[in-house]
Regions:
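Extracellular, repeat-based ectodomains that mediate carbohydrate processing or recognition
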Residues: 1-258
Length: 258
């Protein structure tokens, strides 16, 4: 991941590499990154070692930027803007694929009412077994739990073909205004459906509400829009036929939770 800065939106700095593993500087290694800001002074990042197709032990990491410095969740300084990139080894390990032997992929990050980070990601025990997971910083440690199994990949693989994007989950999105809830897409009775899952005990238990039911076409990649501060929350998702990111006939639907 790289970034560039500007003070006027017209002139931009030369790009800088933000994070990089020592000894793994090849251009083909690409950590996946999700970002959220408090809109004031801090930017929060969650990221992986790379693409799960290429990283059988893909892990989930976290760091925060504020006032020219980079920190772990407990406030330990791990880098400076003038001394980039930040190393994976110095960042928080939220989920350790080396310990479990199961690869992961990041999906979303949000901040709770105390400004602490909450992360949604998938654990991928196999190509046909995707698990939605939820991690949040309690102020003292990372609480990391599974939400629910999600099924297999969501692209509709043609008969007789092997699926190239077998780690493409149905998708999960945190409700930014209240990240104790997520929207996700999982396989129900042979079809991908959208559901809202909520916890009232920091992930120890979950309840869910079906947004779509008994669908004839897939419903995938839910997104809960950022910046909406109303009492109700929205979710948008893709529905239709999807074979590949170059071959699809889909539309976007929206649901308002009242």
């Amino acid at each position: 991941p790289t970034f560039s800065t500007s003070k006027d939106g017209k002139i931009w700095s030369e790009p800088k590499i933000l994070i990089q593993e020592a000894g793994r500087e090849a251009k083909t290694i690409r950590p996946y990154l999700k970002v959220v800001s408090d809109g004031k002074s801090s930017i929060h990042f969650t990221f992986t070692n790379g693409h799960p197709r290429n990283e059988p032990l893909n892990s989930v990491y976290y760091m925060k930027y504020e006032n020219g410095k980079f920190f772990t969740a407990n406030g330990k300084q791990i880098g400076l803007m003038e001394n980039l990139p930040v190393s994976h080894a110095n960042s928080d390990i939220v989920y350790n694929g080396k310990l479990t032997g199961i690869r992961a992929w990041v999906w979303d990050i949000a901040l709770d009412e105390d400004g602490n980070p909450v992360i949604a990601y998938t654990r991928l025990p196999s190509e046909t077994d995707h698990r939605y997971a939820y991690a949040r910083w309690t102020g003292k440690f990372w609480l990391d739990v599974e939400i629910t199994p999600g099924g297999r990949w969501f692209p509709e693989t043609p008969d007789g073909k092997n699926e190239f994007e077998s780690h493409y989950s149905g998708g999960i999105s945190l409700v930014q205004s209240d990240p104790s809830s997520v929207y996700l897409s999982r396989m129900v009775d042979g079809q991908f459906e959208i559901e809202k899952w909520t916890t009232v005990d920091n992930g120890a238990s979950w309840s869910f509400l079906s947004i779509t039911k008994k669908s004839t076409q897939l419903n995938a990649r839910p997104v809960s829009p950022r910046g909406y501060n109303g009492k109700n929350d929205y979710v948008l998702w893709m529905t239709g036929n999807y074979i590949h990111y170059t071959n699809y006939q889909t539309k976007i639907k929206m649901h308002l939770q009242q």
